[in-house]
């Protein structure tokens, strides 16, 4: 597949820069929609409206496993609240998107993930919601969800100390030094580490 070919091309860079930089491959399986449309490989892997989610999860998991075997770390956006149960053990970095950063449920899921999780600023460029999400995800949470075998369970998390803000723009770009300083100041004000 094209994804595996890309991972093969990326692998030498992972090895070359391993002392100074963590290189990972962006592998997104879910597509947030403002209204309607194709929601991604997990939801509709055949691109035909059949919504064969079981196959989508299997394909996603196999792809992540194959990428890991090549020595390449994978990063993905966690959109659906249940799919992390099936793929999170193969994900080295996660993102919570601009449309879901304010969601209490996504903050709770992030608090239990075993990888660093970045929260994107809002679609309007609002940084505070991302900072608040990082602050919420570092704490333990308790919530109802489903286990891998489909049983209802109460989950308890210990918090995720590796949360961070993703500057993704909004009404205008926000990757300049002033925007980074503003994000750092908001993190400090919230009692969080502004590290890069």
Predicted regions and their residues:
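Short acidic catalytic loops
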Residues: 1, 193-196
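Single-stranded RNA-binding surfaces
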Residues: 4
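Active-site-facing alpha/beta catalytic cores
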Residues: 7-184, 189, 195
């Amino acid at each position: 597949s094209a994804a595996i070919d890309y991972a093969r091309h990326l692998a030498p860079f992972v090895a070359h820069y391993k002392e100074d930089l963590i290189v990972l491959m962006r592998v997104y399986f879910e597509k947030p929609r403002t209204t309607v449309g194709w929601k991604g490989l997990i939801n509709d892997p055949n691109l035909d409206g059949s919504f064969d989610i079981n196959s989508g999860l299997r394909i996603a998991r196999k792809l992540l496993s194959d990428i890991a075997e090549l020595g390449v770390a994978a990063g993905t956006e966690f959109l659906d609240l249940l799919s992390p149960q099936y793929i999170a053990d193969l994900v080295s970095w996660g993102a919570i998107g601009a449309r879901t950063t304010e969601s209490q449920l996504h903050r709770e899921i992030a608090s239990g993930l075993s990888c660093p999780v970045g929260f994107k600023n809002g679609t309007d460029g609002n940084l505070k919601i991302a900072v608040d999400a990082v602050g919420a995800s570092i704490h333990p949470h308790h919530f109802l969800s489903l286990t891998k075998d489909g049983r209802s369970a109460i989950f308890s998390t210990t918090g995720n100390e590796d949360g961070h803000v993703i500057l993704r723009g909004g009404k205008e770009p926000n990757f300049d030094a002033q925007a980074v300083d503003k994000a750092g100041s908001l993190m400090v004000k919230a009692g969080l580490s502004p590290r890069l």
